[in-house]
């Protein structure tokens, strides 16, 4: 975009081509722990009826063998997106026997660390790489933190829209990547608002913290919380408390610098990890001793993404073909929704991301990192509902409700454009529903959860188990149509066959495969 171009002029151009917004795409990856009837982490293998966790495109596992990940395709509207997510939940429940999907971001009752099962993907080199990477996560961060779950929201805008927003770019790939990186800068500035409006993890089971020191208070004998927290999941209880991750400050001023720093993190040894080593008792325990084993280890609330081929590294794919979409990673599971996310939340996120894409997005002056934005985010996840809370907007203090209302006013035209493109007024209503939360913090999901714990007089674990059972009953009461069920079953069958094919086609040992995978990483800018 030109130096004299403004958000107002870009919005004006967008209004003339609002129909292009119908080509926006969104997809969801929703995590959820399998638990037994008592709400304890399931220690059973990934059910065979769900297919291969390595190759089934609908259902896989994340860190633990018990941490399900339900994946949708991409959709042009929210309604079919959530319909697919609901169908996948129904399919999973048609297979689960005496188990439930834990419908909270903060984990169920966990066994001792040694007994938390790491996800297993079979004996192919591809599967073993995923498994060993997870062994490394256990060494670096502990297993309990890896059992935290969330909703990842993938979002893209059509190339024709980027051309309207940035007509002066040299080529479509540069334009698209520049646009998404600008979106990410604004997301970094304003994502505290998402945590206030949708954060739903202010409490957790005491057992989760174990013997670790923490700032949490006791709500009851079994529940820890912070009185004004919105999302303990996104607080410094986890990755951000890790020294290697904490010192890693990537640059969001341009894609090339972002990739150069990410490349540095996956190639630079870290002393503590060197002390651990890559092998113990003849077994691989981490892929390497670098700051990050692979790119996906980097902890962030949003990522630039590009689909990769087999054995292709994300840094290489992004460097060669540019950003394809963004992955929003800060959404907590909505415990009131059977599928973990409400339609209004998805619509608001769409409008919010479009606002981030079109609004002015100055470079971050601190070498491409914005400490002020990180501080705002951190304070909101831990005390976002605190009366009189002030945030830092460009060095000037402003109250959270005042800034939030201003942002909603700025987002409103983008919600209206989605309604214009898709018909109806669902986006405007989704945005309007958020105003009440800024005027009344008790209306936020985090406040409602704490109020229900107090009103019902039950600990977090019991409350969450009751809710998860209720959602399971509702989903099981509406079985899939026969043809849809058959489609899921066939995908599961084919995934087992594909895993077997991969295991039979390996022509090198695992050590060689890991070396090749590391060698596939190209420095950005190299050919």
Curated annotation (Swiss-Prot):
GO terms for biological process: glutathione biosynthetic process. InterPro entries: Gln_synth/guanido_kin_cat_dom, Glu_cys_ligase, Glut_cys_ligase. The keyword Cell membrane does not apply. Its EC number is 6.3.2.2. GO terms for molecular function: ATP binding; glutamate-cysteine ligase activity; metal ion binding. The keyword Ligase applies. Pathway: Sulfur metabolism; glutathione biosynthesis; glutathione from L-cysteine and L-glutamate: step 1/2. It is an enzyme of class 6 (ligase). NCBIfam families: glu_cys_ligase (TIGR01434). HAMAP family: Glu_cys_ligase. This is Glutamate--cysteine ligase. It comes from Bordetella petrii (strain ATCC BAA-461 / DSM 12804 / CCUG 43448). The lineage of its organism: Bacteria, Pseudomonadati, Pseudomonadota, Betaproteobacteria, Burkholderiales. The gene is gshA.
